[in-house]
């Protein structure tokens, strides 16, 4: 099983405030993330972390925390990721800036583009390829990005074609993510039933 998540910002105390995260402190946030992750992910699963796993890669506590997270971890590097410490880098099966994979929902296969940053025009977007991204958290920039994609579709831009353009923010603070890795099926289903429709304008 493949799972996806972004922008955990481990050991970044300021993220609790600017994301409005429902935790009193880092210890509480870390404990809940580990609990949700390890109650769901097995060591046979692959978790694609779409950037900003943490603010520091040379922290003994960070290395110890990430080491106990189950599964094969692939880090799609974000602007805050520091993997210069070999001990930390070796916790990931792969570290890269961009990835193209296939996943399935209900027996139907999908092409996915994985990147920390939202991409305005991605490979095969008109053929139904899904973009998973992070970086923008709950910011106005994320809403504008989604509105731009919807505008491209409405104006029949050639790279959008006739298909529904699918771009999903997998930031852990999003209502449909709720601080745990999600499968592609969960992301799609939970996003459309999110109690916060203002966060999912346009094509999500």
Language-model region placement:
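Short glycine-rich loop/turn motifs that provide flexible caps or phosphate-binding loops at active sites
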Residues: 50, 77, 133, 170, ...
């Amino acid at each position: 099983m493949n799972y996806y998540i972004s922008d955990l910002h481990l050991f970044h105390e300021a993220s609790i405030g600017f994301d409005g995260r429902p935790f009193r402190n880092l210890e509480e946030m870390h404990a809940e993330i580990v609990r949700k992750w390890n109650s769901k992910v097995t060591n046979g699963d692959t978790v694609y972390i779409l950037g900003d796993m943490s603010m520091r890669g040379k922290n003994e506590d960070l290395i110890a925390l990430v080491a106990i997270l189950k599964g094969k971890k692939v880090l799609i590097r974000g602007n805050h990721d520091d993997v210069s410490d070999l001990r930390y880098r070796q916790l990931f099966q792969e570290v890269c800036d961009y990835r193209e994979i296939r996943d399935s929902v209900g027996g139907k296969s999908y092409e996915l583009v994985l990147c920390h940053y939202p991409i305005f025009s991605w490979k095969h977007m008109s053929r139904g390829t899904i973009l998973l991204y992070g970086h923008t958290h709950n910011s106005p920039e994320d809403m504008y990005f989604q509105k731009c994609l919807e505008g491209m579709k409405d104006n029949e831009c050639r790279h959008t074609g006739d298909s529904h353009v699918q771009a999903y923010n997998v930031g852990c603070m999003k209502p449909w993510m709720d601080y745990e890795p999600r499968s592609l099926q969960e992301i799609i289903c939970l996003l459309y039933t999110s109690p916060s429709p203002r966060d999912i304008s346009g094509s999500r």
